[in-house]
Amino acid sequence: MASVAMVVSNACSPDPRVMRSARLLASSGHQVTVHAFDRQQGSPMSEIIDGVRVMRYHIGTHTYGSQISTLLGLRAFAKTVKKTLLTNPPDCVYCHDADTLSIGVELKKKVGLPLVFDMHDLQHTWLVMGHPGSILRAFLARRVEKRNLKNIRKADLVVTSSGAIDNGVHAGFREYLQPHGIEAMVVENRPNRCDDHQKQNETKEDWTVGYLGRVREIEPFQLLTQAIEHLPVESRPSIKIAGDGTSVDAVHEHLLSEAPRLGVDLNMSLAFDTDGFSELINDVDVMYAMYNPNRGNIRQGALPVKMFDAASFGVPTLVNSDCLMGEVCKNEHLGGVAQWGNVESIASELLAQREKTVTLLNFGTKQQETFIEAFEHLL
């Protein structure tokens, strides 16, 4: 049994990707502690979840996003975690996403710890979000990307959350890394079973479109309300949104303005845990998971966790076409696809998925077994 220190730059309350990888290692007999950065200091500093200890660092309140205060907060978190782990080194350090990778690199250098890097996202793309024309931000993003790739090469095992499917045409994060001389294994962020509660394939007078997850941009919700407006009044769905994030206030303000104008009911709430997801999705008929493709991580293979989680409850998801998430969605019959910006297509596809049910058949078991084998070989 090995002691594993996982590091993540959010409060892990919850972070499905982090907790699934932690549970996987714990179920194989390893002792896992998640070192999480609770920027808003709103979660317990220490708790045990499914045999995994989550240790949250409260070092003052800090923002999310790409602001200077965010970077200062991350530096303070990294400094504190390094001190903690150097005082009592684990057998392995496991870094989730590039904003924690410097911690693992330093621990590997100073103590010789094996380093696992799990890439769920392309960190440098966040710098240009909302500022696609900024020359300065583009320059900074390239600098960050170069630094991240240099650090990733120092990892002993690299895991990504997406990769091209067999006979597919769209690349994933694994393929993004390959031209840079980095080999990675894919472990997609899938639930390990279908829930007992499944959406029923039946005609209902009222129906609901839901978005359950991080709220990072307003554009998808502007597009959603435009699509709903395109539907006949009697066919318009209620809207349910749950989750926190950098744009949650702006999105709430937008929906509070648009819902009365469209004549639809609105249900809004903030962060939720795994049990909360089960409750929230009970009345959702279609999950909405569309994103601006100008975000680099969308074009380069991001797969929305909510698509797999919704499917485990029988709920279809609407995602972007012309990228990996759309290809996976169609290949596994998990919902519908529409082109970003095509309001008519989005409206039509939402309506088409209204009474459908889906079945998640792939739980990523083979990927997980391959990962455990590689992890234990590393140790």
Predicted regions and their residues:
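Short hydrophobic beta-strand element within catalytic cores of glycosyltransferases
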Residues: 286-289, 309-319
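Membrane-proximal helix-turn-helix segments that form the acceptor-binding/catalytic region
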Residues: 79-86, 102, 106-110, 117, ...
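A charged, aromatic-enriched C-terminal amphipathic alpha-helix characteristic of glycosyltransferases
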Residues: 340-347, 352-379
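N-terminal subdomain of nucleotide-sugar transferases
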Residues: 1-42, 46, 157, 163, ...
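A short, active-site helix/loop in glycosyltransferases that binds the activated sugar's phosphate group
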Residues: 141-184, 191-193
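Glycosyltransferase donor-sugar binding loop
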Residues: 212, 238-252
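Nucleotide-activated donor-binding/catalytic signature segment of Leloir-type glycosyltransferases, i.e.
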Residues: 252-281, 286
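Conserved donor-binding/catalytic core segment of Leloir-type glycosyltransferases
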Residues: 159, 191-193, 200-229, 240, ...
